[in-house]
Amino acid sequence: MKEKIKLLKYLFFFSIFFLFLLYILPGELIEFNKEAVKNRTVFQGSIKHFYYFSYLTSLGLFVYLKEKNYLKIVFLLFLLSAFVEVIHLYVPGREFSYYDILANVLGYLFGFLLITLVKKYIKKD
């Protein structure tokens, strides 16, 4: 079991690294279909933020919730959410968006709620 947790920890930190890479790359390198990007709604752009932060929060809390320092993970993800949006101000082809921050926070809260409910359910069994 410890090996699985260790592997999940590596996956968690790799996912953060991957997210950071996506945010620092110019938009032209990421978006292959430029016409689809132009016609994208705010919801279509921000939903990816919701999914990714739900995933990151769920994975991080699942791995670290048994440890007493899980609040550090919560704080790290909150800072990461704000930091990656601020980076958009300086990366060519990227834009700062309050909707993306909202989607990050909602994804973060959803992941937190999901893991909290799963942990309560597991404790009952």
Predicted regions and their residues:
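Bulky hydrophobic segments
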Residues: 1-101, 105-125
